[in-house]
């Protein structure tokens, strides 16, 4: 049975503290799954952003609200994306460029994001169609999806040309807390999760 320890959800442009030095926020998504969970991790000299939301103007406006009200006088110092899907890395380029800060991702996720962020509607190829047909997708549903496909590039800001590679079992020390990096697969090529034993907190992104 699932237990939900926090009854109050973050308001748009605001955070909820889930553990000392860990803030939870949400960004809206224009789909049936209507939001994404993101996090701020407090370091001694600034904040790490974990996942970014889609590359939409509305998302940037909500980030501006976060910057105005939730940083407690500290700057943003790094962006970490758990994986390459647009709702998780769509604003990474904008954030890194705005604050001149580094991007942290696993190798497989970074380079997949670089490739997929160049996709347009013209990249909906026969191989894509064959895959979904063989997976059993109904023809009418497939045609609807194809008609609405605009490519990752429409919702991903241009990614930085360099990044810090995250590898399985390494540790990041953020604000005196050691976060272990776990690399998963299935949902995406090399999905990053962060775990703090001291806080008993797992930031799992979309990894199940």
Regions found by a protein language model. Name each.
Residues 29-32, 56, 84-86, 185-187:
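Short beta->alpha connector loops
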Residues 47-57, 152-156, 161-164, 171-173, ...:
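Metallo-beta-lactamase
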Residues 23, 102, 178-180:
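Conserved beta-strand segments of alpha/beta enzyme cores
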Residues 28-30, 109, 168-169, 187:
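Short, solvent-exposed coil/turn elements at secondary-structure transition points
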């Amino acid at each position: 049975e699932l237990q939900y320890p926090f009854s109050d959800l973050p308001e748009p442009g605001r955070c909820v503290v889930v553990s000392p030095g860990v803030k939870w926020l949400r960004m809206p998504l224009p789909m049936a799954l209507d939001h994404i969970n993101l996090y701020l991790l407090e370091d001694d000299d600034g904040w790490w952003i974990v996942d970014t939301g889609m590359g939409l103007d509305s998302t940037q406006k909500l980030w501006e609200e976060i910057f105005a009200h939730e940083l407690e006088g500290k700057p943003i110092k790094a962006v970490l994306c758990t994986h390459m899907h647009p709702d998780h890395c769509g604003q990474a380029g904008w954030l890194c460029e705005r604050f001149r800060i580094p991007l942290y991702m696993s190798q497989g996720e970074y380079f997949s994001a670089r490739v997929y962020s160049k996709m347009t509607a013209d990249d909906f190829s026969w191989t894509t169609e064959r895959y979904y047909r063989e997976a059993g997708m109904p023809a009418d549903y497939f045609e609807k999806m194809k008609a609405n496909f605009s490519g990752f590039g429409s919702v991903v800001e241009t990614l930085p040309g360099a990044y810090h590679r995250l590898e399985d079992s390494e540790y990041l020390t953020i604000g005196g807390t050691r976060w272990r990096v776990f690399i998963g697969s299935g949902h995406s090529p090399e999905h990053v999760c962060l775990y703090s034993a001291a806080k008993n907190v797992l930031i799992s992104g979309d990894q199940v």
